[in-house]
């Protein structure tokens, strides 16, 4: 959240140059405040686990957030009871006419399937298209990031011979950027996917900006030029044991998975897990919600043309 200061305070320029968010008294006095409305399209198999992970991050901000859970209307969940889905999830037709401050679309275990072969691909495209006029900012995670980059910008992904699984070191590509405020120069984030998009391909696109990347995992944080779409190719929401559970599941299914990199102590699955990413994940979602949802969204959600463009120094 911003620090409110007098309009002409000399410290303002210094703080802004250090990437500290300050707000003049004039702007603060004219700022309307209300709860943020966030929609979550949950594509992960274990709905309750993913709900908990995302709500934990959203709840770690000073903003009040009202959350709606969205499902694919014609898909039956194999790992979550129908009672849970009917009680807590809505169908797209129920929200089609609404506007939201934020939308989160999760990953999905579909990394080895071509997008057009996904049974609900047309519905995913419909929701992505709808979000561009009904949501202030969209956060795409893992598979959803690749799917949206493909659908919106025509970028192609490459299937990997072995799964990219582990906790990898990342670096910022910019020293000053609102989304990266508070980030260390290097930080860790989990990845779990069977595909990757070439870093060079993304950087060549004029409408996209790579904000963080990894030598091992490639582009990690990508932002659209209009600030509406944020693509995160990893899983900052994962809890401590999620990669372990996936490793055990894949082993039991006879997939002979590699041990997740840099996750178990000494890369030994018999040893303890070292969680290195929780603070980063919390900060990433907090920055997104503050700078690209709360600061940009109109007070009156019925008028999405009133979004405030965010300007930052590169």
Swiss-Prot record:
Coiled-coil segments, which residues? Answer: none
* Location within or outside the cell: Cytoplasm
Its main localization is cytoplasm
Entries under InterPro entries matching the protein = Class_I_gatase-like (IPR029062), HST_MetA (IPR005697), MetA_family (IPR033752)
- One term under GO cellular component: cytoplasm
List residue numbers at the site (Important for substrate specificity). 192
EC number(s) recorded for this UniProt protein: 2.3.1.46
Q: Name one GO biological process term.
A: L-methionine biosynthetic process from homoserine via O-succinyl-L-homoserine and cystathionine
Extract one GO molecular function annotation from the record. homoserine O-succinyltransferase activity
Q: Which UniProt keywords apply?
A: Acyltransferase, Amino-acid biosynthesis, Cytoplasm, Methionine biosynthesis, Transferase
Q: In which pathway does it act?
A: Amino-acid biosynthesis; L-methionine biosynthesis via de novo pathway; O-succinyl-L-homoserine from L-homoserine: step 1/1
Q: Where is the active site?
A: 142, 235, 237
- Looking at the UniProt record, the site noted as Important for acyl-CoA specificity sits at 111
Give the catalysed reaction(s), semicolon-separated: L-homoserine + succinyl-CoA = O-succinyl-L-homoserine + CoA
Enumerate the residues binding substrate: 163, 192, 249
Asked if the keyword Metal-binding belongs to this entry, the reply reads no
Q: Which HAMAP family match?
A: MetA_acyltransf
Protein purpose: Transfers a succinyl group from succinyl-CoA to L-homoserine, forming succinyl-L-homoserine.
Q: Its family?
A: Belongs to the MetA family.
Q: What name appears for this protein in its UniProt entry?
A: Homoserine O-succinyltransferase
| Organism of this sequence | Shewanella denitrificans (strain OS217 / ATCC BAA-1090 / DSM 15013)
